[in-house]
Amino acid sequence: MKANPPLAWHPVPVSAPVNLRWWLMHQESLTRLLQAHCEHFRVEPVFQTLATACIDELEVMNLRRQNQVLVREVYLRCNETPVVFAHSIVKKEHLRGAWRGLSRLGNRSLGTMLFTNPLIQRTPLAFKKLKPHHPLFERACKQLQMRPINLWARRSLFILLRQPILVTEVFLPAIHQL
């Protein structure tokens, strides 16, 4: 048995480059942090539909493979350059509960909603170096001119009224220019 199975997410981004580790470890709103580091910030929605979760999301969300979730994917852009690919999933039944406004966010930041509601609790961050075979790597690279060898990502659960949403943020190469 391997010590670090390929699906594993880790509590510390040990092998991440030092200049990226600062972004990865930031505990507050990534939206606010990006807004502070660029002149023009915007959220570009690219995908939102009911689908099945990625295989490494099933356990953390207490899902079965056939369960439907709302998948929302956006690029966070600084000065029109994509710097983060954000992917969130929430159980379909929770769209009628705690997360009922999620499907209508459009180009508004999910982070703004998550960090302004004092009832929302966040679990500790988990980290992973995504390789080309990971589905989020593939989707994150769609708007990149050159595909990197790997991409670092972080994720955590945000819980409102015992109903979780899993938010994964994939850091794109342009983050190094901020």
Swiss-Prot record:
GO terms for cellular component: cytosol. The keyword Metal-binding does not apply. One of its GO terms (molecular function) is chorismate lyase activity. It comes from Nitrosomonas eutropha (strain DSM 101675 / C91 / Nm57). Belongs to the UbiC family. InterPro entries: Chorismate--pyruvate_lyase, Chorismate_lyase_/UTRA_dom_sf. It catalyses: chorismate = 4-hydroxybenzoate + pyruvate. SUPFAM superfamilies: Chorismate lyase-like. It holds the Pfam family Chor_lyase. Its main location: cytoplasm. It is found in: Cytoplasm. One of its GO terms (biological process) is ubiquinone biosynthetic process. This is Probable chorismate pyruvate-lyase. Its EC number is 4.1.3.40. Gene3D superfamilies: Chorismate lyase-like. It comes from the Bacteria. Substrate binds at R72, L110, E169. Pathway: Cofactor biosynthesis; ubiquinone biosynthesis. Removes the pyruvyl group from chorismate, with concomitant aromatization of the ring, to provide 4-hydroxybenzoate (4HB) for the ubiquinone pathway. Keywords: Cytoplasm, Lyase, Pyruvate, Ubiquinone biosynthesis.
